[in-house]
Amino acid sequence: MKEQKERKLRGNIALIAHDGKKADMVKFVMDHRDILGEYQLHATGTTGQKIAETGLKNIIRYNSGPYGGDAEIGTLVAKGEVDMVFFFRDPLGKHPHDPDIATLMRLCDVWEVPLATNKSTARLLLRNFPKNE
């Protein structure tokens, strides 16, 4: 495998949440809307809809996870179009799209894109990750 080149930050964050974590994601977004408002947000279907209902306008929605949304976000990761991924997942649940989830997580590792799977990690990334102007 080739050595990865340094990626230019684009100011894009992907947001994904399993059903049992959507309320946590919405609360996280509301608690950090001053910072998140400076980024272009990309979200899977229902997660994006719930975030948009809070009044944030800087969000692009993709399909819901089971309908290919996780794979769409994975494509953004592979193309270098996302700086970090916040995926609040339910680690105890089974999901019909588990292969897509595993692929997304693998792509984050391959392309060295920071991946937060819980609020604490997302908070650390958001506060300590520089955004190119």
PLM feature segments, named:
Residues 13-22:
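Short, glycine-rich nucleotide/cofactor-binding loops
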Residues 42-44, 61-63, 87, 115-119:
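General beta-strand structural signal in soluble alpha/beta enzymes
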Residues 40, 57-68:
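Short hydrophobic/aromatic-enriched beta-strand-loop microsegments
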